[in-house]
């Protein structure tokens, strides 16, 4: 879709530099497939799950094409749109290069996947950054949006709303509760793999009811919590 817009209109594609590799890179590269399978295996996923999800990843890659990024959007920059003051706010967490856009003239904040009215965005440590403190980055990004707290929030999903501070507090509280649960699970089973820890956590539909694609997201989220524990408390041993 992006390629068609670029070809048939005067539109341009702009992303944060850290978003470049998953968008612009070649998603069918063998190196990426190997890294993905290694990430699943290192996390303790069963061999049949690794095989299923790796095959799915290859099938999905056939629908991707290399994107032509025409502008890199740095934190604090303004979009090159005459007559508008649209400020780029870098908010890593959901992805490394996630950005929000602040419309300073109309007091609107476009939050993408960063802050949603009821959904909790997936904050995971996937194969592209398996050891990164993505959760710590997300929490810092929530704080970063405080100056736009009175703006109307227009997210990438659901509906627009007001009350950024209240919603951010809800998100932080939920993550804090999950951190406690993950830390307790690790303490109870210090030799457990991330997959085993994930399987033992509470899930709304229950772990056994989840498809393997959903389990992958759950695994990435658990790894993000484990990474945050390791980054904030060096006495914790990494899994």
List each language-model region with its residue ranges.
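Active-site HxH/HxHxD metal-binding segment of metal-dependent hydrolases
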Residues: 1-80, 169
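Feature marks short, surface-exposed loop/turn motifs that line or immediately flank catalytic pockets
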Residues: 21, 118, 162, 201, ...
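C-terminal helical/coil "lid" or tail adjacent to the Rossmann-like core of SAM-dependent
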Residues: 30-34, 168-182, 204-210
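Metallo-beta-lactamase
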Residues: 52, 58-68, 78, 85-179
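C-terminal regulatory/interaction regions
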Residues: 181-239
């Amino acid at each position: 879709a992006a390629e068609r817009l670029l070809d048939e209109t005067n539109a341009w594609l702009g992303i944060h530099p850290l978003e470049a590799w998953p968008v612009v890179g070649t998603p069918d590269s063998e190196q990426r497939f190997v890294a993905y399978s290694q990430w699943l295996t290192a996390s303790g996923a069963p061999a049949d799950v690794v095989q299923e999800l790796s095959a799915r990843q290859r099938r999905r890659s056939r629908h991707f094409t290399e994107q032509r990024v025409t502008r890199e959007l740095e934190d604090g920059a303004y979009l090159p749109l005459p007559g508008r003051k649209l400020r780029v706010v870098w908010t890593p967490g959901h992805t490394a290069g996630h950005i929000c856009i602040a419309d300073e003239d109309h007091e609107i904040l476009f939050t993408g996947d960063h802050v949603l009215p009821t959904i909790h965005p997936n904050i995971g440590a996937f194969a592209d950054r398996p050891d990164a403190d993505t959760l710590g980055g997300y929490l810092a990004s929530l704080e970063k949006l405080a100056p736009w707290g009175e703006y109307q929030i227009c997210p990438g999903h659901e509906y627009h709303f007001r009350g950024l501070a209240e919603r951010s507090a809800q998100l932080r509280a939920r993550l804090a509760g999950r951190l406690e649960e993950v830390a307790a699970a690790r303490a109870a089973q210090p030799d457990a793999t991330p997959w085993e820890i994930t399987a033992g956590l509470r899930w709304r539909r229950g772990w056994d009811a989840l498809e393997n694609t959903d389990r992958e997201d759950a695994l990435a989220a658990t790894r993000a919590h484990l990474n945050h524990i390791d980054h904030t408390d060096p006495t914790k041993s990494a899994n």
